[in-house]
Amino acid sequence: MSYSRKQKRMVSRDPARRPRLPLGLRKRAVPWEHQRSTWRDANPGLIGAALSRAQARPSGNWYVVGASRHLNSTAPWGRTITGREIVVWRDARGTPVAGPGQCPHLGAPLKDSPVRCGTLVCHWHGLALSGAPTAGWEPLPVHDDGVLIWVRLDAVDDAQLPLDAPVLPPRPRLDRSLVSVYTTAGACETEDIVANRLDPWHGAWFHPYSFVDLTVVSAPQRDCADEDDAFVVDVSFKVAGRVVVPVRATFTAPEPRTVVMHITHGEGEGSVVETHATPLGTDAQGRPRTAVVEAVIATSDRPGFRVAQLLRPLAGPLMNHTAGRLWRDDMAYAERRRLLRSTGRFPG
């Protein structure tokens, strides 16, 4: 089968066809102020409707605590989720255990207690917690998905039906992926983090150092079915000068506190970026605090990717650096949104 010159150009632009090299070259660099404005497309009502649909989905009362690989067998984690002290550690088999972070005896902070042979031993009076109910201390359901640790807090929302496991998006095989988890926190609520991620139109304007040539190919209608509730975006990741990596990505919200970006075409097809928002409580000024736990699970079938996997200790910090730069901006977006909502000045 032969192609005309026009057909060849169309095929070369098809995002489903990957070039031999992952990089592309922009014909010309468009100055930031000359790119197409997106404010008309980024309709507050449309974004708000997508947020409302996400908030209506079941979470099963599961909250992300942190990166699985960071929880070792020698020291516990201490976390505050929805104002509740939580402690998490690994037992002698390496299985995570979770429960209240306050010792039931006299209130010692269990996050400061050591783990000995899988047992958490309170450093005030030696109460030993193996993960079973002890002296008024009751364990909490906990889940390790290989990337993240989750804890289930049924007391937070008794209207939610508890689920046996968190609502997880499809992921590439972990043994064939590079995994990085970045965590930060800010003065906002979970809905502000999710709303930020359900606004893909801000990408090339707000993050010009990372994204160029962003086009929202399709956005969900306000009364769409679940299977159509996705934002599809063509975007190029900026490398240097006119050198870019063009991809197509789909943004979905599988549960109220999670937004997932799937790379569906282009370099890294099958890779995902999961953005999870965990409510922490309030700060000394009474402002809500929310943690962002963002997991990047990158994969590729290119031969060179195997080399990148071997360089995991170097790739991880680089991926975290990139996420940190983006979230410095996106947290400012989320905090501004929360401030405007709290003062009745938020549009829409």
Explain the meaning of each model-derived region.
Residues R5, D164-G348:
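C-terminal catalytic domain of Rieske-type non-heme iron oxygenases
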Residues R5, G66-P170:
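Rieske [2Fe-2S] iron-sulfur-binding domain
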Residues R9-G45, D91, T95, G99-Q102, ...:
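N-terminal short leaders/motifs
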Residues S59, G136, H143-D145, E269-S271, ...:
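A short, structural micro-pattern
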Residues S59-S68, N72, W124, G131-A132, ...:
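Short Pro/Gly-enriched beta-strand edge/turn motifs at strand-loop
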Residues N61, A75-W77, R84, V147-I149, ...:
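A generic secondary-structure signal marking the coil-to-beta-strand transition
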